[in-house]
Amino acid sequence: MSSDAPTGPSAPARPHGAIGMVRTASRRVVSVEPFFMEFIAGAEEVLAVHDLSVLLAVVADEDAERRTYARWAESRLVDAVMVVNVREDDDRPAFLADHGIPSVMVGRWDGEPSLPSVRADDVAAMVEAAGYLLELGHRTIAHVTGPGAYLHTQARVRALAAACAPYGIEPVTVEGDYSDDAGERITRELLARSPRPTAIVYDNDVMAVAGLHVAHELGVAVPGEVSLLGWDDSRLCRLTQPPLSTMSLDVHEMGRLVGAAVLETIEGRPAVQDSVVTARLIVRGSTGAPAGT
């Protein structure tokens, strides 16, 4: 893991077989979140065959992310960049193009420049999650999201609201940051509300596991008094008691698809412009019908 690239006269004169990826997050969040480690493993499974590896930088904010890209361009350290957590009005693709670095988007991308993208179908996944909870009888539903600037967060929020609207329900939405701290804090706040949610959807498994711990601490029965639904289906889901229901996304395969798109891009071959990975509902022990139904 790196936060800086070498510069100056000792920098390599040409790319050295690295594919860059920058995470704008605290190192604590990165250290506990399984998603990107599984994603990188999938990408490297494809890239390693071609003597390429992933160079990961963890930075504090968007300005630091741009400075990292600029250093990588100056030192010719990377062949291409995988752009993650696509944002509204995202200027990173244009910035990378201006610096001569090819890129592949991990998330929906309809902007300029036109680039290959690999994304999860967040709308279909949330519609399935919401439909399952509504069919069980839940009518007070909360959603603990990732950062609100991310397009996939916005897509999930809109999809949940649209699914609940025919029932006259307005879900409670609280923004988190994918960390266990956020999962604990927000779950504590939600379980103190009146009326209390009977179901909580989390945008990743780390926050869901943290929420389950809070429910146990407060003596709130899962799923008897509150149902908890995670997202991604990391190994964490099967290690809890009860095991977590979740929206299962094949993150490893998503990484493989991105790795393939990167190879096509740097080799000058046409890349698939929009590859889609679909999550599916996995029901385990943390969800059930609300009490009294």
For each feature predicted by the language model, list its residue ranges.
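Short, well-structured alpha-helical segments in soluble
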Residues: 65-77, 184-194
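Glycine-rich phosphate/diphosphate-binding loops that line cofactor/substrate pockets in enzymes
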Residues: 14-16, 130-141
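Flexible loop/hinge segments that line or gate small-molecule binding clefts
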Residues: 84-128, 206, 232-244
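Hinge/beta->alpha junction and helix N-cap segments in small-molecule ligand-binding domains
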Residues: 25-38, 56-65, 118-128, 144-188, ...
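Amphipathic helical "hinge" segments at domain boundaries
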Residues: 2-68
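Short acidic/polar active-site loop segments enriched in Thr and Asp
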Residues: 17, 79, 139-140, 196-198
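Flexible loop/turn connectors
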Residues: 171, 193-293
